């Protein structure tokens, strides 16, 4: 067996489509790897899969063909038309590997039945393509937070509830995480949805000996905050308030126009700033849907701070970007790094991947410089496989059994050129800034 699978949950959304087009373009050497962190010199020698080693499939509840979605993104200025033309055949091949996702409104029977189908889809994909492993990445629509129930804490109780046709104990993102872990696959949550962040799912990951990472990809406004906030702290300047407004269109804007859907996103953004500056900073944050913006996203921030002798000053900044173009290369980076971690015997939360997330699992470190150092140091150590186990919140776990197969070493930054509803589908369905 050889190769790595990338299984996208929300495979026909903007982020997923951009990632697939980008992967195909990198493989064909049509574009440079701009925005791909794992192509930096610091990752030379890290045993990462090459672009040509990655095979893509996925789930989605939307049926718009991948090529059609890519055409829409090209018309929006996100994908060059020459790249679209050159990757059309590859897009059709990936589209043929996308299966129907789980939707609670259309599913009948117990959630365990849905899990069995999802697991079969993933394992059949892994087997038919002779893959060493599959990384499942959630780029589906942002979900609202869910009420806590005791089944979220205990794996045996969760499994019993999943078998009950009268209950829907897991939201779609967490059901997909459960299916991925059950299939022996690593899981990455690029959304602020509940997803992997349940104690019972942590226990399942450790029992299966697979790693997971998340949550909520950091691509725009929050990225700037994690760079700038430590500057104020290091210079002993007192931040009094940090107000932010996000303007966005497309499916992302429509999805987050619902206050319930936006709640998880706002909470994810707020946690990082509070961790960096403390709870005493006034930090109102708004997300507004502006359909005219399409795929573009604009963030306005106003920072009020106090200096020596009480001098009042402010910083204002504007960030305008194409979110899918910022997120897509990170999806490819996370696939490579998580696959390498799995091959090296890592299991449980990959806190070292905090660099990529607004609300990272397994760590409270939000300072971007420290996250960068943590990531590069950790990646270099992946050359030396070692099993790792992580304790459950309520007790000890058995040592996981690491995989025995190994990935080919990547010897140079340029080596390996060959290479639910989508985040965002607009069908744009997730959000990452």
Predicted regions and their residues:
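Short, small-residue-enriched loops and turns at beta-alpha junctions
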Residues: 143-145, 194-196, 220-221
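Actinobacteria-biased recognition of intrinsically disordered, low-complexity terminal regions
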Residues: 387-433
